[in-house]
Design a protein with these regions (language model features):
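Conserved donor-binding loop and adjoining core beta-sheet/short helix segment
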Residues: 1-52, 158-180
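Conserved acetyl-CoA-binding loop-helix of GNAT-fold acetyltransferases
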Residues: 37-53, 184-201, 224
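Acyl-donor-binding surface of acyltransferase catalytic domains
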Residues: 24, 35-102, 219, 232-241
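Flexible, substrate/cofactor-facing loop regions flanked by secondary structure
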Residues: 94-171
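Short hairpin/turn module used for nucleic-acid contact or packing/dimerization
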Residues: 200-241
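Active-site beta-strand termini and strand-to-loop segments that position acidic
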Residues: 11-13, 22-23, 88, 152-154, ...
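Conserved GNAT acetyl-CoA-binding A-motif
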Residues: 53-64, 199-211
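A structural microfeature
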Residues: 15-16, 76, 80-82, 159-160, ...
Length: 241
């Protein structure tokens, strides 16, 4: 079993399988589910009950092809977040950088400690997974660090990040990660603006933004930028034991 995985359950006749994966939070993420068909709901429920018997809080994406939302609801799970894919023209939000914070291209911040601090701003957000140093080194996963940006506080610590990928005229980013104590500020939109402005200089015209665990206020703010949610997948959390 891979290091991030802790346990797995297989249904009879290969009707379904789920595994539990570690996350940066207390919950374990459920991966897999039950094959589509007349017994899907029954098999999915049985697998989830077995996993829940561990007593550990669990989270799972509602997916009609594997884990239908109505099965999660029947078991008492509650929607606690969502994955959203936003699309639209590159936005230019009017914003300001909070006092004591500076924003610079990721290419100018190669130090792994600083990058790790910035990446950890996602740690409490439902849907985000564990990352290794190999995932955050300059250029990891073909990210364009000329375009992606990082925010540093007065002590030089990473307090925000927006990683970026360019493909022709399309910029793809993850929703900016912000240190909890700064989430009430305009830093999220400041990072987004800096990244979009840099992408525009390289010919980008359109944005694809992937967001996990954003708050309702952040979701509304993205709607107000003229972006359209083309994919929304609810994320459920098991009820406390």
């Amino acid at each position: 079993m891979l290091p991030q995985f802790t346990a797995a359950w297989l249904a009879a006749d290969g009707a379904g399988v789920i595994a539990l994966r570690r996350t940066p939070r207390a919950d374990l993420e459920v991966l897999g589910g039950a094959r589509p068909g007349p017994q899907q709901a029954e098999v999915a429920a049985a697998l989830l009950r077995a996993a829940s018997a561990t007593g550990t809080p669990l989270s799972a994406y509602a997916d009609d092809t594997l884990l239908p939302g109505h099965v999660l609801q029947t078991l008492g799970w509650e929607q606690a977040g969502q994955y959203t894919e936003w699309r639209g023209p590159l936005p230019t939000p009017e914003t300001s950088v909070p006092a004591g914070v500076r924003i610079l291209p990721l290419a100018d911040a190669p130090d792994l400690t600083v990058r790790r601090e910035a990446q950890d701003t996602y740690a409490d957000r439902l849907g985000h997974t564990l990352v290794s140093d190999a995932d955050i080194v300059p250029g990891a996963h073909e990210a364009d660090d000329r375009v992606g940006h990082i925010a540093l506080d007065g002590a030089g610590r990473g307090v925000g990040i927006c990683r970026a990928w360019l493909d022709g005229d399309t910029l793809t980013i993850g929703s900016p990660g912000i240190y909890p104590d700064l989430r009430h500020t305009a830093l999220r939109h400041a990072l987004l603006r800096a990244t979009c402005d840099a992408a525009r200089l390289h010919g980008a015209q359109r944005l694809v933004m992937q967001a996990w665990g954003d708050t309702p206020a952040e979701t509304q703010a993205d709607t107000d930028l003229g972006l359209q949610a083309v994919t929304v997948t609810p994320i459920y959390r098991s009820r406390p034991a």
